[in-house]
């Protein structure tokens, strides 16, 4: 197929073609919607719903939009804009209820946080990329330092310097073009490219460095303009002050201010100025080439070193001649550092990408062409300067050998180099090009045009880069400077900031001091651009489809390494400073964690790494040395049982998997599920809990828990421990609920999961605080009031829901109720800690500190300080105490491992482990204790004491037995539900075990009543041998009136080993 006709669609021939649509032979007309559907779409029920209408005796067909809810593929459906069209959601097409709200994923996908400023002048590739790149490349070095580079490095190494610079720039341009053509590029230039490719940390860091480099480059070019202007004035006997440096500062400040005003006026004025400046520069370069070909016009020019093109001069100047110059012993890399800023204009088009009509096409085309032309021009000027001028010249005509008015020997004019008294020549004068030109004043105009045009381009790009950073809210300090003004959205505040930054470096008034500084900054930026392309091409996310094909992944990597190597070779100290600045800015953004999602390649790499790691982990055999408890926490919504989630986090913190299971008996719409997911994830992040939430809906507790147990996780990343709360209402709940709870334990054991049950005083369930209105992004409100009128916290408009999505920082005064932990009253009295006050505080007047503060929810539930403290029981710092472990039965070691993990956390570091174990033979007590101590030593578990329990078989006290009988009385009656009835036969059969549990209660009360946490082996509920109420009665007796209790039963595979 001919490529030219590749995208042309031929018309369909035939008589059955109407209105450009090929019609079949048979047309069936039928109603396309029911009356209900018509009403939903705003069509009257009695309106005609046929596919054809008769009007004025002719047929017309209804449009497709009237026949279907479906949306056709349109560009507007994919735009990241609030004004973009929105295709029908899946819920609308499927017929779900509650579909009026856009999916959160789609809202995040739309770039609402990075709005583009008001639309201004849009430029094509010539005006927007080609000319700005040429002007930026043809900068201060073109007329003021290129001849000096030739004098130091010689023609040969000068061409090498140009070649290395060209290679770096070409590779970077190819990399930049690949990124720019992988979708639409908005305003922000280099920052936008890198941030959307590698993420906000890299993009913002390089963006700040690049903006700073451009601001300093503007001052550097302004200094070049001032130097040239002052040389012209002084050559004519004019001066502003006695000090040339002050002249540079005065003229530079005025010039900088005028250029900022020109840029702030708008793109159209700046574009008109560029066209004028580019014409002057090209004319000055032609003037230099013509003058060099013509040769010296008089003997004074020969005496000043301009001898005309000759092979002898070319050969003499071909080799290098590095000397002490500019307060430094020059070498190849120091000269390279001075020259490199003259080729750093390749980003000029990308910097104003938001002002381009078609950035994806304009940036590659304009940049590469500008780079080609500028490198050719630099090469020609090096060849002409090196082939037509001497390195040293005295300027004295008397040093010339003149015969019959013709100079026959000019070698003597260079003898001044022996005593360093030469004032002219490539080494000593920056005005060589003016000397070699056909008309000298034109070179001054070209120099001014080159310097001012580059400064204009830099000054134009910096405010827009700052604006992009501010709009994205990466660095809060830049938000103030990003405000757009006028119909073109000009960042006037950014121009003011740019002016003062450039002015600060303008006051240095030394071009050669500034050039190496910005060379490192530009090289760092180019290195990141190349790394962006390499990383994206390496990861190859599905979204990586650049239309620019002339790039190579390994070439981009080579460009990255080359930039870093050149940075270190040019000035290693400044390179380290640049790296330090970059990583500081990187860490600031990383610490702030901006809420952005730009689909960067680091995210794609994260996904690929996680996937490959999960596959590799699945192929790796399990080993006891690598065991970690991976928890499935049946907490419902995490806000409802914060203490249970905190305990799970205490065990799995930053080391293993934790999944919070949420079971809902109602069938929830997608909208409600999404709102719950957002609310739960935000709550977990706010509480600094690393966990995943897994939700099932439309199931009762037992089948929902079974689904979570069997379906949670992937590969080896699957739960191996089920953590759940103790059912404190087991004596009053419906029989089905009690049986379901008990059956979940059997389900866990059937799937070979370990089980852990936690009980705390007052219970774990605070779901009454969390209302069911999660789809509105809010839960039951929690407010604090005081019994004293003076210390009131509740105010109108400050009722905050427990899991509200509202940003509390936007309310005044600031009450952080999002995690239900912290509340500060008007007297700065913090309730979150709930610690005991010392004696001095207790002695204060009751009116001062002993007010009773009560927390009220929307449902009227009151929470005391004690209840609030219980909600944060496993989160707050524990005072000195003990962590008692009753390791009664060998379950593989999990019962001893979990408390050891807890004791290693900083919040529980003050709690010492006390181990309680059962003795098998009373007459061998000492031997049993020695064996247990030896086992613990081999496991390398530190403990403060070891107690062997020897009277476990003693009968319980009568009052203990009476308490047990009272507990199970309801379930032994004839009227009890058959599923929850404890028969006399069961009591008799399990009498020995029951007495053992009752005896354990007495031992626990005697030894562990003051412990911070008690961890105990969970009795094994043998399937078919024990009923749910009797088993719960065992747990009730062993945990009532005791500190927080954690029952643990491992899956009887070893989780500890004493082998290395």
Curated annotation (Swiss-Prot):
Can you tell which superkingdom this protein's organism belongs to?
Eukaryota
Q: Name one GO cellular component term.
A: membrane
Q: Which GO terms describe its molecular function?
A: sodium:potassium:chloride symporter activity
> Per UniProt, what is the membrane topology?
Multi-pass membrane protein
Q: Keywords on this record?
A: Chloride, Glycoprotein, Ion transport, Membrane, Potassium, Potassium transport, Sodium, Sodium transport, Symport, Transmembrane, Transmembrane helix, Transport
What is one Gene Ontology biological process annotated in the Swiss-Prot or TrEMBL record?
Answer: potassium ion import across plasma membrane
Q: What does this protein do?
A: Electrically silent transporter system. Mediates sodium and chloride reabsorption. Plays a vital role in the regulation of ionic balance and cell volume.
Give the family, as the similarity comment puts it.
Belongs to the SLC12A transporter family.
Q: What is this protein called?
A: Bumetanide-sensitive sodium-(potassium)-chloride cotransporter
Which species is this UniProt entry from? Answer: Manduca sexta (Tobacco hawkmoth)
